Amino acid sequence: MFDSSKLDAYLTGLCQARDLPGVSAAIMGPDGLEYAFNYGFRDGAFTRPVDNDTLFGVASMSKSMTALCACILACEGRLDLNAPVSDFFPEFELAGQPREAATVRTLAMHTAGIPPMEPLEWSIAMNSEGRSESDWLREMKRTAPNKMETIDQIIAYIAHCGYNTLGAPGEVMSYSNEGYAILSYIVDQAAGVPLEQFMQARIFDPLGMTRTILDNGVEAARALSGGNITSLFEVEDGRRTCDDCWSVLPPF
């Protein structure tokens, strides 16, 4: 049995060092909950403490689960991880690379060669109604070529925006939101059902994750949480902001 007080102290130190507003962590074992840690608050007024039942936004944890879905499909012979991305999206291409060079695997491993890009931020800015005004939001709305609300718009941007790739697919690791957006739609095609439905049936339900949901708009999550849900905390220009309007970015 591990010393929970040492883990409490370690996690508390991390939260304080990073000035995190609220954190929840847990260790689950075969017999259920073995350890729980809650720190800070879930609201901007710092009046509502985080507890074991507080819902947090899934954010980019969805990438890990998307990769797991792809691996499940690969194990079942329903998805070839070495298949070119262009097999699923014929319009997909990377500047200066053979059309078939980028594969499902390179998307999943962030090694397709796609550099950091703006489409995710444009999608947030153009589709998240009710977000508090900020310099960032105004700049994203000013520069967005469209609402970035479909996967086709992302693929077209990658193909025609004129950037340089970071290297041939498989050579360079660079975290890519756009790559995972495309991967999620490949999982849709291979599974024959929407990613959210496949993830629910093959990951959440078998693990008893009854309070986990992919919700593009947060309404269902708020209902599921009974109001025990975090606000959205962000840092812009060194200043922390809090917003009850969660990000909406349809193709991501």
List the predicted regions and their residue ranges.
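Short, conserved catalytic-motif segment at the N-terminal edge
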Residues: 2-58, 78, 156-167, 218
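Residues at or immediately flanking beta-strands
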Residues: 22-24, 84, 172, 213
